[in-house]
Amino acid sequence: MEKIKEMSVEEKYDKIYDQYILTDVIAMAFVKEMGLTDKYLEYSLKVYKKMMPSIMGSAFKFIKMLTPGRAFKKFVEGLFKDGQVTEPLSTTEVVSLSDREAVIKYKNSVMLKKYRDIIKKTGLKLDLKEYWELFNEAGKEMVEDFGFDMTSHIEEDSAITVIKLKK
């Protein structure tokens, strides 16, 4: 047997990312086919809300102590930092940013491309825009706890997210 060389971090990341999306696509297609979409979203939201403190780390407690404008900016900064898990900064563009609203565009989205490729390869009956809307509903409810409103939609190969400070 030939000596197997260690995968690079980039190769590992790419394979893990593909596996994550494949698992997500399978779950959503199954849930949709079984008519369990509402239950799945309800369950996902419950789990994510419990995990929010560990997902956001120390920022979770800290963000609620700040003035609304500063908390909003910290939240948006956190999205940029954590968002690099699915989108490189090179595809991320801040269309507008104030202490009350942020419009973020992920141009030529790596994540959208991966989802489209995997949905096509698997042949599963899943519409990416429909999936995105469901994903957006769960995200919207999570950020409401922080006093923010969030919407997201797909425009061709880009995803646009708008986050607003309520009040």
Regions found by a protein language model. Give the residues of each.
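Active-site glycine-rich loop that binds ribose-phosphate moieties when present
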Residues: 135
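A beta-hairpin/wing motif
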Residues: 158-162
